[in-house]
Amino acid sequence: MRGVETRIQEIRHRIFREVARMAYHTEWPVDKRIEALPYKIIPGEVGNYRNDVFLERAIVGERLRLAMGLPCRSAAEHAPLSDNIEAADKPETYYTPPLINIIKFACNGCAEKRILVTEGCQGCLAHPCVEVCPKDAIHLDRYNGRSHIDPEKCIQCGRCADVCAYNAIIIQERPCAAACGVDAIGTDVNGKADINYEKCVSCGM
């Protein structure tokens, strides 16, 4: 989220600070240093961000490699962080394409788009959401009159959200896909975000 200092920004600052230190202190053995850095950036035995300290360190490790211009790796690759580290020390190479990457094991795999009825539904008498649904995907609870959406029928057109007077129906989208102006982010076979590099303009949004 641009303009807002978040915990992601905090981690990013730490990572770039450590990479800059490695570049400045040329006497340090880079291969040993990079292996130790995830433990320095994410100390202790309990995760602070994802409740899994090992996952946090693995993600930080890949972020360190990407910050040094090395390629993004999958979780299936068994190799130390220092693998091919010498490629980062070539003055003619700034980074290994692509510029924008998704660390797959860091992705939450959230839904691309879904429409939800929140607790704000008042079970109103008019129920315009039911009336405008082109697929008859909304039914009313027989006890409290609140709306419920059948995900099997819903085509996610959003008309119900548009007509709700209480703003009780929300449209949830995958944040990265919603931010992409060229529709370059889709979903892979594992439900993780995936970049179509033929569309991607590397804007970083």
State each model region's role.
Residues M1-V163, N167-A179, D183-G186, G191, ...:
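Ferredoxin-type iron-sulfur electron-transfer modules and their immediate structural context
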